Protein backbone atom coordinates (compact mmCIF):
# COMPACT_ATOMS: atom_id res chain seq x y z
CA UNK A 1 0.00 0.00 0.00
CA UNK A 2 2.92 2.34 -0.68
CA UNK A 3 2.17 5.75 -2.11
CA UNK A 4 3.94 9.09 -2.57
CA UNK A 5 2.74 12.10 -0.59
CA UNK A 6 4.02 15.65 -0.44
CA UNK A 7 4.57 18.27 2.23
CA UNK A 8 6.64 21.44 1.99
CA UNK A 9 8.67 23.63 4.30
CA UNK A 10 10.78 26.79 4.16
CA UNK A 11 13.42 24.92 6.16
CA UNK A 12 15.05 21.58 5.45
CA UNK A 13 14.54 20.86 9.15
CA UNK A 14 10.77 21.26 8.81
CA UNK A 15 8.06 21.25 9.81
CA UNK A 16 6.74 19.89 6.50
CA UNK A 17 3.13 20.90 5.95
CA UNK A 18 0.61 19.46 3.47
CA UNK A 19 -1.96 21.20 1.26
CA UNK A 20 -4.38 21.55 4.17
CA UNK A 21 -1.82 22.80 6.66
CA UNK A 22 -1.32 19.45 8.43
CA UNK A 23 2.10 18.39 9.68
CA UNK A 24 3.35 15.27 7.89
CA UNK A 25 4.48 13.75 11.19
CA UNK A 26 1.19 14.35 13.00
CA UNK A 27 0.38 11.55 15.45
CA UNK A 28 -3.18 11.05 14.20
CA UNK A 29 -4.22 10.34 10.61
CA UNK A 30 -7.30 8.13 10.98
CA UNK A 31 -8.61 8.79 7.46
CA UNK A 32 -5.22 8.49 5.72
CA UNK A 33 -5.49 12.04 4.42
CA UNK A 34 -2.26 13.73 5.53
CA UNK A 35 0.08 14.70 2.69
CA UNK A 36 -0.79 15.74 -0.85
CA UNK A 37 -1.17 12.41 -2.70
CA UNK A 38 1.11 12.68 -5.74
CA UNK A 39 1.05 9.03 -6.82
CA UNK A 40 -0.51 5.71 -5.79
CA UNK A 41 -1.40 2.35 -7.31
CA UNK A 42 -3.29 2.74 -10.59
CA UNK A 43 -4.81 0.93 -13.56
CA UNK A 44 -5.85 2.25 -16.97
CA UNK A 45 -8.46 0.32 -18.95
CA UNK A 46 -5.81 -1.34 -21.09
CA UNK A 47 -2.43 -2.66 -20.05
CA UNK A 48 -0.70 -3.45 -16.80
CA UNK A 49 -1.96 -2.41 -13.36
CA UNK A 50 0.67 -1.04 -10.98
CA UNK A 51 0.88 -0.75 -7.22
CA UNK A 52 3.13 0.52 -4.46
CA UNK A 53 5.09 3.51 -5.84
CA UNK A 54 7.69 4.69 -3.37
CA UNK A 55 11.35 5.30 -2.43
CA UNK A 56 11.38 8.32 -4.69
CA UNK A 57 13.90 10.99 -5.63
CA UNK A 58 13.41 14.36 -7.34
CA UNK A 59 15.69 15.53 -10.17
CA UNK A 60 16.08 19.00 -11.72
CA UNK A 61 17.77 19.21 -15.14
CA UNK A 62 19.74 22.00 -16.84
CA UNK A 63 16.64 23.00 -18.84
CA UNK A 64 14.67 23.72 -15.68
CA UNK A 65 12.44 20.63 -15.88
CA UNK A 66 11.68 18.53 -12.80
CA UNK A 67 11.31 14.74 -12.57
CA UNK A 68 10.07 12.19 -10.05
CA UNK A 69 11.98 8.89 -9.95
CA UNK A 70 10.45 6.00 -8.01
CA UNK A 71 10.12 2.26 -7.77
CA UNK A 72 6.78 0.63 -8.53
CA UNK A 73 5.49 -2.93 -8.86
CA UNK A 74 3.12 -4.66 -11.21
CA UNK A 75 -0.14 -5.71 -9.59
CA UNK A 76 0.45 -9.01 -7.84
CA UNK A 77 -1.74 -10.20 -4.98
CA UNK A 78 -0.26 -13.70 -4.97
CA UNK A 79 2.45 -15.05 -2.64
CA UNK A 80 5.02 -15.04 -5.44
CA UNK A 81 7.75 -12.42 -5.46
CA UNK A 82 7.30 -9.42 -7.75
CA UNK A 83 10.42 -7.39 -8.59
CA UNK A 84 10.25 -3.60 -8.56
CA UNK A 85 10.45 -1.51 -11.71
CA UNK A 86 11.55 2.11 -12.04
CA UNK A 87 9.42 4.93 -13.44
CA UNK A 88 10.43 8.51 -14.23
CA UNK A 89 7.66 11.10 -14.53
CA UNK A 90 7.88 14.81 -15.17
CA UNK A 91 6.78 17.08 -12.34
CA UNK A 92 4.63 20.15 -13.02
CA UNK A 93 3.87 22.93 -10.55
CA UNK A 94 0.62 24.63 -9.63
CA UNK A 95 0.33 28.42 -9.52
CA UNK A 96 0.83 28.34 -5.75
CA UNK A 97 3.78 25.98 -5.80
CA UNK A 98 2.39 22.47 -5.29
CA UNK A 99 3.74 19.62 -7.45
CA UNK A 100 1.70 17.19 -9.51
CA UNK A 101 3.21 14.48 -11.69
CA UNK A 102 2.70 13.48 -15.30
CA UNK A 103 -0.03 11.03 -16.26
CA UNK A 104 2.47 8.66 -17.89
CA UNK A 105 6.11 7.77 -17.23
CA UNK A 106 8.75 9.02 -19.62
CA UNK A 107 9.37 6.81 -22.63
CA UNK A 108 12.27 6.33 -25.04
CA UNK A 109 10.48 8.68 -27.45
CA UNK A 110 10.74 11.59 -24.97
CA UNK A 111 13.75 13.64 -26.07
CA UNK A 112 13.73 16.25 -23.30
CA UNK A 113 13.90 19.03 -25.91
CA UNK A 114 10.69 20.63 -24.67
CA UNK A 115 6.94 20.23 -24.86
CA UNK A 116 5.29 20.19 -28.29
CA UNK A 117 2.64 22.84 -29.08
CA UNK A 118 -0.95 21.71 -28.43
CA UNK A 119 -4.13 23.30 -29.81
CA UNK A 120 -7.63 23.27 -28.33
CA UNK A 121 -8.84 21.21 -31.30
CA UNK A 122 -6.32 18.50 -30.45
CA UNK A 123 -7.45 18.40 -26.83
CA UNK A 124 -11.16 17.78 -27.50
CA UNK A 125 -12.08 14.11 -27.29
CA UNK A 126 -12.76 11.09 -25.11
CA UNK A 127 -10.41 10.38 -22.22
CA UNK A 128 -9.68 7.99 -19.42
CA UNK A 129 -9.21 9.71 -16.07
CA UNK A 130 -7.67 8.65 -12.77
CA UNK A 131 -8.41 10.79 -9.71
CA UNK A 132 -5.73 10.37 -7.05
CA UNK A 133 -7.97 10.69 -4.01
CA UNK A 134 -6.65 9.54 -0.61
CA UNK A 135 -8.31 6.33 0.66
CA UNK A 136 -7.88 3.76 3.41
CA UNK A 137 -6.49 1.39 2.30
CA UNK A 138 -5.10 3.27 -0.70
CA UNK A 139 -5.14 0.26 -3.02
CA UNK A 140 -5.27 0.61 -6.83
CA UNK A 141 -7.27 3.42 -8.42
CA UNK A 142 -8.90 2.56 -11.77
CA UNK A 143 -9.61 4.91 -14.66
CA UNK A 144 -13.10 6.12 -15.62
CA UNK A 145 -14.51 7.84 -18.76
CA UNK A 146 -14.09 11.57 -19.32
CA UNK A 147 -15.07 13.90 -22.18
CA UNK A 148 -13.87 17.35 -23.28
CA UNK A 149 -16.18 18.89 -25.92
CA UNK A 150 -15.36 21.78 -28.32
CA UNK A 151 -17.99 24.03 -26.69
CA UNK A 152 -16.27 23.78 -23.30
CA UNK A 153 -18.50 21.03 -21.90
CA UNK A 154 -16.80 18.65 -19.44
CA UNK A 155 -18.08 15.24 -18.37
CA UNK A 156 -16.59 12.68 -15.98
CA UNK A 157 -19.03 9.82 -15.35
CA UNK A 158 -22.05 11.64 -13.86
CA UNK A 159 -20.11 14.85 -13.14
CA UNK A 160 -20.75 17.73 -15.56
CA UNK A 161 -18.91 21.02 -15.79
CA UNK A 162 -16.83 23.27 -18.04
CA UNK A 163 -13.28 23.32 -19.29
CA UNK A 164 -11.07 25.89 -20.97
CA UNK A 165 -7.62 25.95 -22.53
CA UNK A 166 -5.63 29.05 -21.75
CA UNK A 167 -2.73 28.18 -24.08
CA UNK A 168 0.88 27.75 -22.95
CA UNK A 169 -0.08 24.16 -22.10
CA UNK A 170 -2.36 25.25 -19.27
CA UNK A 171 -6.08 24.79 -18.76
CA UNK A 172 -8.87 24.79 -16.22
CA UNK A 173 -11.76 22.44 -15.38
CA UNK A 174 -14.66 23.59 -13.17
CA UNK A 175 -17.54 21.55 -11.75
CA UNK A 176 -19.65 21.98 -8.64
CA UNK A 177 -17.56 23.76 -5.99
CA UNK A 178 -14.26 22.61 -7.53
CA UNK A 179 -11.70 24.10 -9.90
CA UNK A 180 -8.90 22.03 -11.38
CA UNK A 181 -5.68 23.54 -12.67
CA UNK A 182 -4.21 21.34 -15.40
CA UNK A 183 -1.20 20.95 -17.66
CA UNK A 184 -1.70 19.73 -21.23
CA UNK A 185 1.01 18.05 -23.29
CA UNK A 186 1.76 15.37 -25.88
CA UNK A 187 3.21 12.17 -24.51
CA UNK A 188 3.53 8.43 -24.93
CA UNK A 189 0.58 6.22 -23.94
CA UNK A 190 2.39 3.23 -22.43
CA UNK A 191 -0.72 1.03 -22.54
CA UNK A 192 -1.86 1.74 -26.11
CA UNK A 193 1.66 2.20 -27.51
CA UNK A 194 1.01 5.52 -29.22
CA UNK A 195 1.43 9.25 -28.73
CA UNK A 196 -1.58 11.09 -27.37
CA UNK A 197 -2.70 14.14 -25.40
CA UNK A 198 -2.04 13.79 -21.67
CA UNK A 199 -3.42 15.88 -18.83
CA UNK A 200 -2.43 16.17 -15.20
CA UNK A 201 -3.49 18.63 -12.59
CA UNK A 202 -4.56 19.58 -9.12
CA UNK A 203 -8.03 20.30 -7.75
CA UNK A 204 -8.79 23.26 -5.51
CA UNK A 205 -9.04 20.91 -2.50
CA UNK A 206 -5.62 19.36 -3.12
CA UNK A 207 -6.60 16.22 -5.07
CA UNK A 208 -4.48 15.44 -8.13
CA UNK A 209 -5.63 13.73 -11.33
CA UNK A 210 -4.32 12.17 -14.55
CA UNK A 211 -6.06 11.80 -17.89
CA UNK A 212 -5.17 10.56 -21.37
CA UNK A 213 -6.99 11.04 -24.67
CA UNK A 214 -8.17 7.76 -26.22
CA UNK A 215 -10.46 8.81 -29.08
CA UNK A 216 -12.40 11.40 -31.04
CA UNK A 217 -15.87 12.64 -30.20
CA UNK A 218 -18.67 11.12 -32.29
Locations of the language-model features?
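Carbohydrate-active catalytic/glycan-binding domains of CAZyme proteins
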Residues: 1-218
